[in-house]
Amino acid sequence: MILMVIVFLLLLFWENELTEDVVLTSMEHLHVDYPQSAVPLRYCNYMILQRVIREPDYTCRKVHVFIHERPQKINRICTSSKKMTCPNYSEIFCFQSDTKFRMTVCQLTGGSKYPACRYQISPTEGFVLVTCDDLGPVNFQGYVE
């Protein structure tokens, strides 16, 4: 009986670990900030620290984009008629949004190792490019102004 309880607890812990990793790498976690967080100063620095956005080797990401649109609107990109080959990938298809989305582009200005990264904020609007699977957007591939 005790062995069964231990096995159950181990499985429960292991399942939660996997779920947390998936959430932390999802497109919504990495790129969607709706409604836009009310951070008056240093928006990019704050958001990148809060969401632990960095390269796998703990270096600072050179450029990062936050999209300020409803997740439902972002999910609809996958049904767009604007299907094309993704930039820099010859065999992967991207979908482009039908309308321009409000975004914030964070450009690295200082630091090289996370968390000592400093960013400049650039509000912009553009057509969003994503890759999709059967459940919706998977990866943000960029934007077109």
UniProtKB/Swiss-Prot annotation:
Q: Where in the cell is it found?
A: Secreted
Keyword Transit peptide assigned: no
Q: Which residues form the signal peptide?
A: 1-19
Q: Which of this chain's residues carry glycans?
A: N88
Family annotation (InterPro entries): RNaseA, RNaseA-like_dom_sf, RNaseA_domain
- Give the GO biological process terms: defense response to Gram-positive bacterium
GO annotation, cellular component aspect: extracellular region
Cite the entry's keywords alphabetically: Glycoprotein, Secreted, Signal
Query: SMART domains under this entry?
Result: RNAse_Pc (SM00092)
The molecular function GO annotations come to: nucleic acid binding; RNA nuclease activity
Task: Name the domain of life this protein comes from.
Answer: Eukaryota
Sorted alphabetically, which SUPFAM superfamilies does this protein's record hold?
RNase A-like
Q: Give the record's family classification.
A: Belongs to the pancreatic ribonuclease family.
Q: What does this protein do?
A: Does not exhibit any ribonuclease activity.
- Specify the protein name: Probable inactive ribonuclease-like protein 12
Organism equals Rattus norvegicus
